[in-house]
Swiss-Prot record:
Region (Disordered): 758-777
Biased composition (Polar residues): 765-777
SMART domains in the record: WD40
Keyword Repeat among record annotations: yes
InterPro entries in the cross-refs: Beta-prop_IFT80_2nd, TPR_IFT80_172_dom, WD40/YVTN_repeat-like_dom_sf, WD40_repeat_dom_sf, WD40_rpt
Function in brief: Component of the intraflagellar transport (IFT) complex B, which is essential for the development and maintenance of motile and sensory cilia.
The organism of origin for this protein: Rattus norvegicus (Rat)
Classification lineage: Eukaryota, Metazoa, Chordata, Craniata, Vertebrata
GO process terms (BP): apoptotic process; articular cartilage development; bone development; bone mineralization involved in bone maturation; bone morphogenesis; canonical NF-kappaB signal transduction; cartilage development; cartilage homeostasis
Entry GO terms, CC: 9+0 non-motile cilium; centrosome; ciliary basal body; cilium; cytoplasm; intraciliary transport particle B
WD repeats: 12-50, 104-143, 145-185, 186-225, 227-265, 267-306, 504-542
Listed name of the protein: Intraflagellar transport protein 80 homolog
Length: 777
């Protein structure tokens, strides 16, 4: 990826350009110390003077009023705030009319920024004050006051906090009066510029120490650059938070969100005092010290999938290369390419007006449909369909171009959704809520309606990343997510009545990805690269989960690596320095998944015997129990040395009825409640009481015996035997109450138990067992 620079031979301004701002993706306004505001039209390459300001007004900062989201096409911003050296800020219309001038600070007003909703304006000045203003320019509050100038300011993603500079310090101050203020030393020189992205919640800072840095919202440094030759005078995030630009003397740099540099350009611009990204994130404009306005387009973005490599060579041209035979195809587009995604044998490209869908089998005939709004901010793909996110909503389309659904939820803000907070599978869409980050919304892909009974997935901590598995049946669909403590959890997306368990899979997990061909999960866990060959094992046999893992040292990937993709058995990891590392994992677990999904149990056992890996046997054991194939489970558990479980499975074979076997399989997986329910529904009250006795669940055993008026003496007898074994006295009031005057006769109890078992066996053999449990013999 690099920047394609365009610079006029002669500058349009006579003095330094202090600030620039985009109205649409093709129109820019620039302000200069020559008191002129100039409009640039990039389609016609024309410039026109909008207004000449009075000679005593030297503009310093410009920010357009935020456009209303969700309106068809790109609504143009109609007014902007201009801060100036005379201590005022000016509200100016698009046509150049000064609507209002407000005395704001003593000395120059160094920066002014609208919040994301356009309901408030923050200004900072040489007098060290941070002030909040209403939309119409009425003072609401003075947020902060200090003895040194505040050079730059930025709103937090929720518009509830403000970030500003204080010499070498950065300060995050909430608007609530008594809330905690976060302050830290960020640079060794005065901080000149800051920016805070609403999508990734990361902070940029630039200082006179010639460095730029990336921070999280807690003030932890994620990246610090090497010192440059000159002070860094400007930084700016791309709207989607994936890239940022850095400006210095004769220097323009394009960087990834993690800090490493994609491209360095050395245009003849003087210092770049201000950088603005276009609304679609494809180009930047810089305000230059020598009167120029520099424009740069982001080109040579690259997408890879299996043997295909797609490169954006020009704004409207892509090159597709098949690395197997070196065949090259050129794709021409009518409009500028904004976003693209290559996955699941399809390339999806959005331009400013249309969406193109190419199949990797045929690059010549794309499917084309018009977009509701021009600026697509996110494309996600699944095997059967893909998701587009723009300012107006979320839209699901098939690869034939057919519109499928558009999920909606209260307070939806599409401008802050990214690949970490939205996940797509063949039947489900998962979206993390921004208002309450502990909640995940789950939707049916086919209808866009909430999944199941409409219950939300709620967690005890804030969630940072979500991912749906890609294969298998809808009822078995799982979602994995990482919370703010870096713990990895897994749960079922099926939300009918009973609350599904959320189970922890790992700790200190930084990034995760599901395989696209089978339900294998991988993640970078502290200093380890971990692959969960069968994550579903947590619901079947939690004890065997550690044996189903593959782990290797990940210290070679340095700090903060990120998993880019997991295709087949190939995992691609992006290191902190920007380099890509490919990791190959064993292909056998994927083959095992395929055999099991086709119920080819003999082939699965044969594969495990051939490979002779404990992790594969452990996976097969858990898969067999999940699919109620206890013959295969017995073989697999024996292979991993779990003799106690082999004996338990053997004991199940002697159980008199299918219901009892089913109940004991559920108990084997830890589902005690379901096991008891199955027995009670089948009328096997004694068996239900006995499993509670075996688990020392005395309260429940007595409760069932009393409720069904049977085997009270059996429960009391086993309780007495238990107390005698441990040399204890009875203290439970209910047991004391029922034991009064009851003579325990073990002969009678054993005869009654034998009768129950005989009755159950007879009923089973005569075919009266009404419920088919789907149990494999």
């Amino acid at each position: 990826m690099r920047l394609k620079i365009s610079l006029l031979k002669e500058p349009k301004h006579q003095e330094l350009v202090s600030c620039v701002g985009w109205t649409t993706a093709e129109e820019l306004y620039s302000c200069s110390d020559d008191h002129q505001i100039v409009k640039w039209n990039l389609l016609t390459s024309e410039t026109s003077l909008i207004v000449k300001l009075p000679d005593d007004i030297y503009p310093i900062d410009l920010h357009w009023f935020p456009k209303s989201l969700g309106i068809k096409k790109q609504t143009q911003a109609e007014s902007f705030v201009l801060t100036s050296s005379d201590g005022k800020f000016h509200l100016i219309s698009k046509l150049g009319r000064v609507e209002k001038s407000v005395e704001a600070h003593c000395g120059a007003v160094l920066a002014g920024r609208w919040n994301y909703e356009g309901t408030a304006l923050v200004t900072v000045g040489e007098d060290g004050q941070v002030k909040i203003w209403s939309k119409t320019g009425m003072l609401r509050s003075t947020l902060a006051q200090q003895g040194i100038p505040v050079y730059s300011v930025a709103w937090g993603p929720d518009s509830e906090k403000v970030l500003y500079t204080a010499g070498k310090q950065l300060i995050i101050k909430p608007l609530q009066p008594n809330a905690k203020v976060l302050q830290w030393k960020a640079h060794d020189g005065i901080i000149l510029k800051v920016d805070w992205n609403s999508v990734n919640d990361l902070i940029l800072s630039a200082g006179e120490d010639c460095k730029y840095k990336v921070w999280d919202s807690y003030g932890r440094v994620l990246y610090g650059s090497q010192p440059h030759e000159h002070p860094i005078t400007s930084v700016a995030w791309a709207p989607d938070g994936e890239l940022f630009a850095v400006g210095s003397f004769h220097t323009l740099r394009l960087c990834d969100k993690t800090g490493w540099s994609y491209a360095l350009e050395k245009p003849n611009t003087g210092s770049i005092f201000n950088i603005a990204w276009s609304i679609d994130g494809t180009q930047i404009a810089g305000a230059c010290g020598n009167g120029h306005v520099v424009f740069a387009h982001v080109v040579e973005q690259r997408w890879e999938w299996k043997n295909f490599q797609v490169t954006l060579t020009k704004r409207r041209t892509m090159q597709v290369r098949n690395v197997l035979n070196d065949a090259v195809d050129l794709l021409e587009f009518r409009d500028r390419v904004i976003k693209a995604s290559l996955n699941h044998a399809h390339l999806v490209v959005s331009t400013s007006l249309q969406c193109y869908v190419f199949s990797t089998k045929n690059w010549n005939t794309p499917l084309i449909f018009d977009l509701k709004e021009g600026t697509v901010s996110l494309i996600l793909q699944a095997e059967r369909h893909f998701l587009l996110v723009d300012g107006g909503g979320i839209y699901l389309h098939s690869y034939e171009g057919r519109f499928i659904s558009s999920p909606k939820f209260p307070g939806m803000r599409t401008d802050i959704l990214n690949a970490q907070t939205v996940s797509l599978s063949n039947d489900t869409i998962a979206i993390k809520d921004k208002a309450d980050e502990k909640i995940i919304f789950l939707f049916e892909a086919s209808t866009g309606k909430p999944l199941g009974d409409g219950k939300l997935l709620s967690h005890k901590n804030e969630i940072s990343e979500v991912a749906l598995d890609q294969k298998g049946l809808t009822n078995d669909r799982k979602i994995a997510f990482i919370d703010k403590n870096r713990d990895l959890y897994i749960t079922s997306v099926k939300r009918f009545g009973k609350e599904e368990q959320i189970i922890k899979l790992g700790t200190m997990v930084h990034t995760l990805a599901w395989c696209d061909t089978c339900n294998i999960l991988c993640g970078l866990q502290d200093t380890r690269f971990t692959v969960w060959y069968y994550p579903n094992a947590v619901y079947v046999d939690r004890d065997i989960l550690p044996k189903t893992l593959y782990e290797r040292d990940a210290s070679e990937y340095s700090k903060n690596p990120h998993i880019v993709s997991f295709v087949g058995n190939q995992v691609t990891v992006r290191r902190a320095d920007g380099s890509l590392v490919h990791i190959s994992i064993s292909p056998y677990p994927a083959i095992l998944h395929e055999y099991v999904s086709s119920s080819k149990w003999e082939d699965a056992v044969r594969l495990c015997r051939f490979v002779k890996e404990q992790s594969l046997w452990a996976c097969l054991a858990a898969m067999a129990v999940a699919n109620r194939d206890m013959v295969t489970a017995e073989i697999a558990y024996a292979a991993v040395g779990e003799i106690d479980k082999v004996r338990y499975i053997n004991a199940m074979k002697d159980l008199p009825s299918r219901e009892s076997k089913m109940a004991h399989i559920l108990m084997f997986s830890g589902n005690i409640q379901e096991a008891e329910t199955i027995l009670l529904q089948a009328g096997l009250v004694y068996q239900a009481i006995q499993i509670n006795i075996n688990l020392y669940n005395w309260e429940r055993a007595l409760e069932l015996a009393v409720k069904y008026k049977t085997h009270v003496d059996t429960v009391l007898a086993y309780r007495q035997k238990f107390l005698e074994t441990f040399g204890k006295q009875e203290t439970n009031k209910r047991y004391l109450q029922y034991a009064e005057g009851l003579q325990i006769d073990w002969e009678k109890i054993k005869a009654k138990i034998e009768m129950e078992i005989t009755k159950e066996r007879d009923r089973s053999s005569s075919g009266q067992s009404s419920k088919n449990t789907g149990l494999k013999p």
